[in-house]
Amino acid sequence: MKKQSGFTLIELMIVVAIVAILAAIALPAYQTYTKKAKFTEVVSATGTYKSALEVCFQTVGSLLNCTNGTNGVPPAAGASGLVTSVAVSGNTASAATITATGDATTFGATSNVYIMTAAGSNGQIIWTAPASGSTCAGAGFC
């Protein structure tokens, strides 16, 4: 009689169970990773405003008049892709805030806000990002 070679049914079932367990662990981690990668679009949307505020601060000498649509700062941006809005607000002579909001459907309504604050003094701006009030930090997106 010839000996048969191959896998038994129980061995195949064990392999399928192991693969299913690994997939169940990897899937949530992958979903968080993809949301974090998508949130970079929201963070990068602030770049134009950041550069414009720095130029305005050097030109004007304060951040007070560096608001949306003035002194080279772009007007507030509406929805585009995964970004819902970007705006400069709360300007004083030495401080300003850039707030970018991501799509609530993609990132969740409680984790879609990215805030950068500028503190200007002695001819330079020091940025804090993500600043207080950024809900994306709690979700690990920024």
UniProtKB/Swiss-Prot annotation:
- Just give the chief location class: membrane
Q: Which domain of life is it from?
A: Bacteria
Gene Ontology CC: membrane; type IV pilus
Q: What happens when the gene is disrupted?
A: Mutants have no effect on the bacterial adherence to host epithelial and intestinal cell lines.
Q: Name one GO biological process term.
A: type IV pilus-dependent motility
**Positions bearing N-methylphenylalanine:** 7
Q: Which Gene3D superfamilies match?
A: Glycoprotein, Type 4 Pilin
SUPFAM superfamilies given in the database record: Pili subunits
- Residues annotated as coiled-coil are none
List locations, semicolon-separated. Answer: Membrane
TM helices/strands, residue ranges: 7-27
The record's section on PROSITE patterns has: PROKAR_NTER_METHYL
> Keyword annotations for this protein?
Fimbrium biogenesis, Membrane, Methylation, Transmembrane, Transmembrane helix
Q: Which residues form the propeptide?
A: 1-6
Q: How does it sit in the membrane?
A: Single-pass membrane protein
Q: Which InterPro entries match?
A: N_methyl_site, Pilin, Pilin-like, T4P/T2SS_Core
**PANTHER family from the UniProt entry:** GENERAL SECRETION PATHWAY PROTEIN G, PREPILIN PEPTIDASE-DEPENDENT PROTEIN D
Q: Which family does it belong to?
A: Belongs to the N-Me-Phe pilin family.
Q: What does this protein do?
A: Major component of the type IV (TAP) pilus. Aeromonas hydrophila possesses two distinct families of type IV pili: the bundle-forming pilus (Bfp) and the type IV pilus (Tap).
Protein's name according to its UniProt entry: Type IV pilus subunit protein TapA
Identify the coding gene: tapA
